[in-house]
């Protein structure tokens, strides 16, 4: 390359002097004072080690390969692809050089490791074979493209593709031989680039070549696997090589930085474009940007004593910037100082660049940011601003110099010329030293003229200063460069995909940060802060504002949540995203598989030519890191949305049915059918009337199939608690909703309950006649949101889940149509990827954040007489509980086999054994209870009680009846159990006995069922429940309970009382007529209890006969001290004894 050909903007009168301003490697002796300047130059030339060679073949080649690759990304068109192969083969297999050997030699030099000769020769031979076959394939592809219907060209291109693909699969391992992975890495990366480009052709042209769809899919999946494999290999061994060169001295850092710079150019830059070879993700020409920075060598001669120079860590920590948003150089403000020469006869004084600060802008922003000072301004003699505003600096020429003293040297840069596309800028401390340091030796252009073919632009300048009292002084500027593709404007095009790296943001949230990238992304990553806002990007829309775009975001995280895209502060896109990895570390440690894409199904249109795009997160499942790599804009045609809706609906409808459309697929739920129906409803009837009508008919047919396989009656909840249909039975607290954003049909709304004994519930029993023996059935449904919702399916035992589901399906502001109705078409994007039951989490028996749910139940043998059936129950037993759910169904899933069959047989046997035991137990209780009840009644018709039957005896019979188990189902106390008929029979007789008891008792409310009603009491008397009975409680000696009762005079009565005394003293019941005739029953705590007369421990029944002389009598209950409990007071005519 002719370095004097600087393009039209450069100074054609300047002649570049190739003499080197290098010092000797040793401190010069005092004899310097006797030298003249020409003698000094003679010594420096004689003792200077060989300089970095100009025109590095390996680097020159890879920057051209990268340029060619960037221009052919995505699917740029057939001519671009053939020209790409033609250019690449010319670059990598030129006639007069072995470029692959140059690649190996370059890395061998950097890491000082030679490849074993056999491995080297084998790799070179195989590369030669690949080059020959690639040329043949390129010609065959071009011939076929020119004659696509010619069978001969088709056969030839297929043969050449398969041969070349097989060679790549066979030879790639030779480019990663164990022990030589690093020196072979450039070869590996460049070969991988070609293999991925080849595999792209299979997806693009495979159907036209006659490949089967399976063959195309196999090749495509292999390509995706290789993208990941090749990317990870490149990064792994790049990092390994870099860590191998870690050191402690300045010279070691120089080599370390050269390895980093050259391997970025030769390996990582090309690895960054591997994903874009995926022709399904990148289906058109694609524009991407390499935002990584590379650093050219410090502008300095070799320091004579490396031990006194800047240390490795100082260079890395000071010269190398921390990760940051991409910025663009606007101005350098440079200070100049002077080193006085030891002798002007030997050399002139050195006016040198001593300090500077940098002003820069961020992408598409007018704000100017200025750094602090690099260096120390003390002692400077002049300063000035050097503006580069809007001028890409693609090349620098510098004059690194040294002033030599007998025992020390002072290093500095006398002048630098900055060559830009709009002209050049010259910093000149003086003009006595020659421009010998050329940046294009390290960052060459992709051809000539340089101002058109440059590959990098200057973006920043750092500096290292090192001085000690007795040794070398040095102020060393260090330039950093970005790739030319990382342009200032984020241009969005009408005809190609635009991939904007996240580090092109101009503003981040205060807690969001830029972190080091993993190496294969072409730059660094943005890591979210603690809140939802991430940052803002400015874009330039180079297309009509009517143009529509799809959007996707490349990200890595171990959290799930909602990703929002705002345009000009208005919400444009929202979508739920899932974690891409289970655990995640720092950005630099991520692998290719750590990343995924958030793809939005709806399109956007930009409101103006320079929109602000904001990235935002919501509803994160935890605080783990979230990394953003890039956001992509894919142009689509004006009817893309409607076409996508049609294709999406067609695909969705087809996936509902089994082959032949005779039945629904097993995995298809009733909710899914409804959602597909909504997709069909959203199809444009104007653009696709026939297709929409056909799909509507199919989805209606699918809904009928869904109803027909559903074993539940009334799946639309039209007849809850109906006396005409044996379907759903429910409690209060249930509302039937209809037609919202989530549900197309009816759905249930459950509220919480104030009493756990009376939950909000809904249940249904599926009749035995609907079931098959030894079969599995599934209860399925969909929950919009819920808390403490319990779902049961019951046969031999209960399968139970508590369902807590977050209300995270829809945004806070819901889209509505012009009539104020739910706009389901607009809301569909939020429901496209609902979490399924397989993605839910289970903790402490609670199924969380699963909108779709499913519970299994298996049948054993079928017995229509027993009619065990399957019970389905939903309930909420807490005040805080709520639920909104629907699309309930129970469907047959198939026969149970193997372990499941054995398990259900064991369950049935266990259930039958339990049932037999229960039957025996119940029969024994029934016999006892029947006998006890028979003893209460005077006749078989249960129309009269025996006169001597006491309250305690009735209560004792009731206790026996209440000991019967399985009267109601354990999971819901209102559903009759297996012993409910027996219990109902016996309980009816108990109730009849109490009714007859109350009828013959002339003392109303004698069992205190109505509390203190009809009694006159003092304030300290109360009634409390004890063992199913209401008991009158007197706690103090002055407590008093009174009652007046009207009787027949001159008739005999029996006063019978069941009571209990606690503590000292006595309790009493006194009966007195108006003439003062009195009688009394007394109770004490020390009385002997007649077991036959005792119902509950401590309670005693006593009676007396009373013959009133007046119509009215007075009853008084009291005590002398302690506590007195009265269960029942009965007063009845003695004639009842007859």
Curated annotation (Swiss-Prot):
UniProt keyword terms in alphabetical order: Sporulation, Toxin, Virulence
Protein's GO biological process: sporulation resulting in formation of a cellular spore; symbiont-mediated killing of host cell
One MF annotation (Gene Ontology) recorded for this entry: toxin activity
SUPFAM superfamilies per record: delta-Endotoxin (insectocide), middle domain, delta-Endotoxin (insectocide), N-terminal domain, Galactose-binding domain-like
Record carries keyword Lipoprotein: no
Pfam families referenced in this protein's UniProt entry, alphabetically: Cry1Ac_D5 (PF17997), Cry1Ac_dom-VII (PF21463), Endotoxin_C (PF03944), Endotoxin_M (PF00555), Endotoxin_N (PF03945)
Keyword Cytoplasm: no
Protein origin, superkingdom: Bacteria
Function as written in the Swiss-Prot or TrEMBL entry: Promotes colloidosmotic lysis by binding to the midgut epithelial cells of Coleoptera.
General remark: Toxic segment of the protein is located in the N-terminus.
UniProt similarity note: Belongs to the delta endotoxin family.
UniProt name for this protein: Pesticidal crystal protein Cry7Ab
């Amino acid at each position: 390359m002719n370095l004097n050909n600087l393009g039209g903007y450069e100074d054609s009168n300047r002649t570049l002097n190739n003499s080197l301003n290098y010092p000797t490697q040793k401190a010069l002796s005092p004899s310097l004072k006797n030298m003249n300047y020409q003698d000094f130059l003679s010594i420096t030339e004689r003792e200077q080690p060989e300089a970095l060679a100009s025109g590095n073949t390996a680097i020159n080649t890879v920057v051209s390969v990268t340029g060619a690759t960037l221009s052919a990304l995505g699917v740029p068109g057939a001519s671009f692809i053939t020209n790409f192969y033609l250019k690449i083969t010319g670059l990598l297999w030129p006639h007069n050089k072995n470029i692959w050997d140059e690649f190996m030699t370059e890395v061998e030099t950097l890491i000082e490791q030679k490849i074993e000769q056999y491995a080297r020769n084998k790799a070179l031979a195989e590369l030669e074979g690949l080059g020959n076959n690639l040329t043949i394939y390129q010609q065959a592809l071009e011939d076929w493209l020119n004659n696509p219907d010619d069978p001969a060209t088709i056969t030839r291109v297929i043969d050449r593709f398969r041969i070349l693909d097989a060679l790549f699969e066979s030879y790639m391992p030779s480019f990663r031989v164990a022990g030589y992975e690093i020196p072979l890495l450039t070869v590996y990366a460049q070969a991988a680039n070609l293999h991925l480009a080849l595999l792209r052709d299979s997806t693009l042209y495979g159907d036209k070549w006659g490949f089967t769809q399976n063959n195309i899919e196999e090749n495509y999946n292999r390509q995706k696997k290789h993208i990941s494999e090749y990317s990870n290999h490149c990064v792994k061994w790049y990092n390994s090589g870099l860590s191998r060169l870690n050191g402690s001295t300045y010279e070691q850092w120089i080599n370390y930085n050269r390895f980093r710079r050259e391997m970025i150019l030769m390996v990582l830059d090309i690895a960054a474009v591997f994903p874009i070879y995926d022709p399904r993700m990148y289906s058109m020409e694609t524009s991407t940007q390499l935002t990584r920075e590379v650093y050219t060598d410090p502008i300095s001669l070799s320091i004579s004593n490396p031990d006194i120079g800047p240390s490795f860590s100082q260079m890395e920590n000071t010269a190398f910037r921390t990760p940051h948003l991409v910025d663009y150089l606007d101005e350098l403000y440079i200070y100049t100082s002077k080193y006085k020469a030891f002798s002007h006869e030997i050399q002139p004084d050195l006016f040198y660049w001593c300090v500077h600060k940098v002003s820069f802008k961020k992408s598409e922003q007018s704000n100017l940011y200025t750094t602090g000072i690099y260096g120390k301004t003390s002692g400077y003699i002049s300063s000035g601003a050097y503006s580069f505003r809007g001028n890409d600096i693609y090349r620098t020429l510098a004059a690194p110099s040294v002033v030599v003293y007998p025992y020390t040297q002072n290093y500095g840069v006398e002048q630098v010329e900055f060559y830009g596309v709009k002209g050049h800028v010259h910093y000149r401390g003086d003009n006595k030293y020659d421009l010998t340091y050329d940046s294009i030796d390290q960052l060459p252009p992709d051809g000539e003229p340089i101002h058109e073919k440059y590959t990098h632009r200057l973006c920043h300048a750092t500096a290292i200063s090192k001085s000690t009292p007795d040794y070398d002084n040095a102020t060393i500027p260090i330039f950093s460069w970005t790739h030319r593709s990382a342009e200032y404007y984020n241009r969005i095009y009408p005809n190609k995909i635009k991939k904007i790296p996240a580090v092109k943001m101009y503003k981040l949230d205060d807690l969001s940060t830029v972190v080091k990238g993993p190496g294969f992304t072409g730059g660094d990553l943005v890591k979210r802060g603690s809140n939802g806002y991430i940052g803002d990007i400015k874009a330039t829309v180079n297309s009509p504002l009517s143009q529509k775009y799809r959007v996707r975001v490349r990200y890595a995280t171990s959290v799930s949540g909602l990703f929002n895209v705002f345009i000009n502060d208005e919400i444009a896109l929202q979508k739920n995203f899932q974690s891409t990895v289970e655990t995640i570390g720092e950005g630099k440690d991520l692998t290719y598989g750590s990343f995924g894409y958030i793809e939005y199904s709806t399109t956007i249109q930009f409101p103006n030519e320079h929109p602000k795009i904001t990235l935002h997160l919501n509803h994160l499942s935890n605080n783990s890191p979230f990394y953003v790599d890039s956001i992509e804009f894919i142009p689509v045609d004006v009817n893309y949305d409607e076409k996508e809706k049609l294709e999406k609906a067609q695909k969705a409808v087809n996936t509902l049915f089994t082959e032949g459309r005779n039945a629904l697929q097993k995995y298809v739920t009733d909710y899914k059918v409804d959602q597909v129906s909504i997709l069909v409803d959203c199809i444009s009837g104007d653009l696709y009337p026939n297709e929409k009508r056909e799909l509507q008919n199919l989805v209606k047919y699918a809904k009928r199939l869904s109803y027909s396989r559903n074993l539940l009656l009334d799946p639309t909840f039209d007849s809850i608690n109906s006396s005409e249909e044996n379907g759903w039975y429910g409690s209060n607290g249930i509302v039937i909703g209809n037609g919202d954003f989530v549900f197309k049909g009816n759905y249930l709304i459950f509220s919480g309950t104030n009493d756990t004994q009376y939950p909000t519930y809904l249940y249904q029993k599926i009749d035995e006649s609907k079931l098959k023996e030894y079969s599995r059935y599934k209860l399925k449904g969909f929950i919009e949101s819920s808390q403490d919702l319990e779902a049961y399916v019951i046969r031999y035992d209960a399968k139970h889940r508590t369902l807590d589901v977050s209300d995270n399906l829809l945004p806070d502001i819901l889209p509505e149509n012009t009539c104020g109705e739910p706009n389901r078409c607009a809301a569909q994007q939020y429901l496209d990827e609902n979490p399924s039951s397989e993605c839910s989490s289970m903790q402490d028996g609670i199924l969380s954040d699963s909108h779709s749910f499913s519970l299994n139940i298996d049948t054993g043998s079928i017995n229509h007489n027993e009619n065990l059936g399957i019970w389905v129950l939903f309930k909420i037993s807490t005040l805080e509980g709520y639920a909104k759910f629907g699309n309930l169904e129970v469907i047959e899933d198939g026969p149970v086999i193997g372990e499941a069959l054995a398990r259900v047989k064991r369950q049935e046997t266990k259930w039958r054994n339990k049932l037999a035991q229960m039957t025996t137990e119940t029969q024994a209780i029934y016999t006892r209870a029947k006998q006890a009840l028979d003893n209460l009644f005077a006749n078989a018709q249960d129309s009269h009680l025996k006169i001597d039957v006491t309250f305690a005896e009735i209560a004792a019979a009731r206790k026996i009846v209440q000991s019967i188990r399985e009267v109601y189902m354990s999971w819901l106390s209102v559903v009759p159990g297996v012993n409910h008929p027996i219990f109902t029979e016996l309980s009816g007789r108990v109730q009849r006995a109490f009714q007859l008891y109350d009828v013959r008792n002339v003392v109303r409310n004698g069992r205190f069922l109505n509390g203190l009603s009809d009694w006159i009491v003092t304030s300290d008397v109360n009634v409390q429940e004890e063992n199913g009975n209401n008991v009158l409680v007197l706690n103090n000696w002055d407590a008093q309970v009174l009652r007046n009762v009207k009787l027949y005079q001159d008739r005999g009565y029996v006063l019978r009382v069941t009571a209990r005394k606690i503590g000292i003293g006595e309790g009493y019941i006194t009966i007195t007529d108006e003439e003062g005739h009195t009688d009394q029953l007394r109770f004490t705590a020390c009385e002997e209890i007649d077991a036959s007369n005792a119902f509950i421990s401590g309670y005693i029944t006593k009676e007396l006969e009373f013959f009133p002389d007046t119509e009215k009598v007075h009853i008084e209950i009291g005590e002398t001290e302690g506590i007195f409990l009265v269960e029942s007071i009965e007063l009845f005519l003695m004639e009842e004894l007859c």
